[in-house]
Each structure stands twice: as structure tokens, then as C-alpha cells.
Amino acid sequence: MKNEIELIGVYGSDKTHAMSAWTSTNRELTEEKQNRIPALLKMLAENGHETPFEKSSLHFLVTAEIASHIHCLKHRIGVSINCESARYKELKDDKYYIPHDWSNEEQILLQNHCVESLEKYHAALARLTPTLGRKRAKESARFYLPYATQLTFDVMFNMRSFVHFQRLRNDEAAQVEIRDIAQEMLKLVKECGEFEHTLIAFGL
């Protein structure tokens, strides 16, 4: 199964960032000032005046393997993240990720491993529940889950933190899976059409 990314919420725009910056002088938005928004955003980005870019929000729903979830968890400033938990519920969908750049033979081996591990997870949960209780059984049976298990989580960035995320994760040095996620996120933000000049200002 592939990792999936959906943009489920957007607050703000290029105008929001510009108006935040103009709060320090005059928030009255004339036609002349509106025409200066692209240049203003470029100046702010180039000179490190980035607090106005914290006034917007980008909210994504992501389904990805554990490694990419951990990569996202490492971004804490201006980022909020919640994830489904195998401690609180049984993961019944049996979702797992197969690397697309592996050979067909290797993909089959991993798929078989995931299927077997998930079967053991469900079986262990059933065996452990009578003696340990449902709560402890759920949180301990998950040790059978493979690292390829996919979790669904929602993550929200402000634009400043999103730019930081892009610079680190949408990079050749990043792991392929998180880089693919970052690229898809950027594509979705571009398609929403609210941040054209902000993204240009940061070279994205």
C-alpha cells in the first residue's frame, strides 16, 4: 500500500502574511499596498523576518509507515500532530507500506512478512486479553507489528514551520518515503492557490 496525503484544512493566504507584517505600521490595505504583497513577502523571507508566516495553518491527514511518522514527530515548533494508537485500539485495517524501489521479489518477501506479523498481532491480542485484560493486551500485542505498519495521523503546520519541514525533508539527503510525503504536501499547497507568492519568496 502506498503512503497517502490529503490537505484537509487551510487558514490564511499571502494576504494574511502581508497584513500581519503591516501590523507594525498600518494595516489599512490599499490597492497600491496589495500590489506590493509579492515584493513584501520576498523581502521578509530574504531577511529572516518570519513571524508573519506563522499566522497561517496547513492541516494534513497522512497515512504512512512508522519511519515517516517518526520523521514528522521530530518537527515540534509550530507543528501539531496526533496519531491513531495501537495502545488504545486494535489496528484492524492491516495497512502496511512496501517500498516502490525494491525488486518484485523483495516486495513479495516483505509483503509475506507483514501479513504473517499482522496475523500474529491479532492472534496474540486474542490470547492475551483473557489473562491481561483488553487494555494491557492491546498495548503489548503491538510488539508483533512490523515497522512497515502504516498509521494515520493528522499534522498541522504554520507556514514558517512548513518551510522548515520542506527544507529538511524535501531534500536529496532525506529518506525517500518522507521526501515523497514532503513533495506531495508541497504540491497540494501549491494547488490550493492561497500561498503562491509566499512559496516563491522562500524558493519553493
Range-by-range predicted roles:
Residues 1-204:
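Family-specific signature for flavin-dependent thymidylate synthase
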